[in-house]
Curated annotation (Swiss-Prot):
<protein>
    <recommendedName>
        <fullName>Non-structural protein 3a</fullName>
    </recommendedName>
</protein>
<keyword id="KW-0922">Interferon antiviral system evasion</keyword>
<comment type="function">
    <text>Involved in resistance to IFN.</text>
</comment>
<dbReference type="InterPro" id="IPR005214">
    <property type="entry name" value="IBV_3A"/>
</dbReference>
<keyword id="KW-1090">Inhibition of host innate immune response by virus</keyword>
<keyword id="KW-0945">Host-virus interaction</keyword>
<keyword id="KW-0899">Viral immunoevasion</keyword>
<feature type="signal peptide">
    <location>
        <begin position="1"/>
        <end position="22"/>
    </location>
</feature>
<keyword id="KW-0732">Signal</keyword>
<dbReference type="GO" id="GO:0052170">
    <property type="term" value="P:symbiont-mediated suppression of host innate immune response"/>
</dbReference>
<dbReference type="Pfam" id="PF03617">
    <property type="entry name" value="IBV_3A"/>
</dbReference>
């Protein structure tokens, strides 16, 4: 009798962990995309400044 609730609890915990991991993976992917976009913006902002500095030399 004791076994079934504990096994049910274990299954519940495993499912919850799976859910958390999948959400975490989605979050990481979204974060990577955001970082890439930010890097592109920074690069596009730096490019004119770098050319400006070189033209001043």
């Amino acid at each position: 009798m004791i076994q079934s609730p504990t096994s049910f609890l274990i299954v519940l915990i495993l499912l919850w962990c799976k859910l958390v991991l999948s959400c975490f993976r989605e979050f990481i992917i979204a974060l990577q995309q955001l970082i890439q976009v930010l890097l592109q913006i920074i690069n596009s902002n730096l490019q004119p400044r770098l050319t400006l500095c070189h033209s001043l030399d």
